[in-house]
From Swiss-Prot:
Pfam families: DsbB (PF02600). Residues 1-9, 62-68, 162-175 are cytoplasmic. One of its GO terms (molecular function) is protein-disulfide reductase activity. This is Disulfide bond formation protein B 2. Keywords: Cell inner membrane, Cell membrane, Chaperone, Disulfide bond, Electron transport, Membrane, Oxidoreductase, Redox-active center, Transmembrane, Transmembrane helix, Transport. The gene is dsbB2. The chain crosses the membrane at residues 10-26, 45-61, 69-85, 143-161. Belongs to the DsbB family.
Length: 175
């Protein structure tokens, strides 16, 4: 029963990611909301989460494979969570907080010899800081933050249920 539950959870996660990407493309095409750089990063993370979850649902792996898929989904969801969190911070930060952030990021990019990214960063950081659309008073990056939080919590169920199962069998002398 455990594997059937995790397979269903992975399928739900892939369905949620596909729905989110569909809504994002609808908002871009029908409403005219152009995505910024951080929005594109979040879209890539949603696509990666969806593909990974769909592969896990179709593959129906054993306990070891479920752990691996769960860990991969957790890492990708945490990366998306970082991108969405950064965009939410950019939207709530004041101008005096944005300038040192952009300056520090420019220094890091120049150390990495990514000077061509600096001009794009300057314009995109200000573009990402704009709140262009809300639903129920919540902006799109905040919705993404909520979705990535759910996607990060979802793989914890298989990971911790496996851990509790392992601890229970170890206490009985099963291993």
């Amino acid at each position: 029963m455990y594997l059937a539950r995790t397979r269903f959870l992975f399928f739900l996660a892939s369905l949620a990611c596909a729905s989110i990407i569909g809504v994002a493309f609808y908002l871009q095409q029908a409403v005219g909301l152009d995505p910024c750089t951080l929005c594109m990063v979040q879209r890539a993370a949603f696509i990666a989460c969806g593909v990974l979850a769909l592969c896990a649902a179709c593959h129906a792996p054993g306990p070891t494979g479920t752990r691996r898929y769960s860990l991969g989904l957790l890492l990708v969801a945490l990366a998306g969570l970082a991108g969405a969190g950064t965009q939410v911070w950019l939207q709530t930060a004041s101008a005096d907080q944005l300038i040192p952030f952009i300056t520090r990021l420019e220094q890091i990019l120049s150390l990495l010899s990514l000077d061509m990214c600096i001009d794009r960063l300057r314009s995109d950081a200000l573009f990402c800081a704009e709140i262009t659309w809300t639903l129920f008073g919540i902006s799109l990056p905040e919705w993404s933050l909520l979705a990535f939080t759910g996607l990060a919590l979802l793989p914890l169920y298989p990971l911790f249920s496996e851990l509790s199962h392992w601890l229970a069998t170890r206490d009985r002398g099963g291993y």
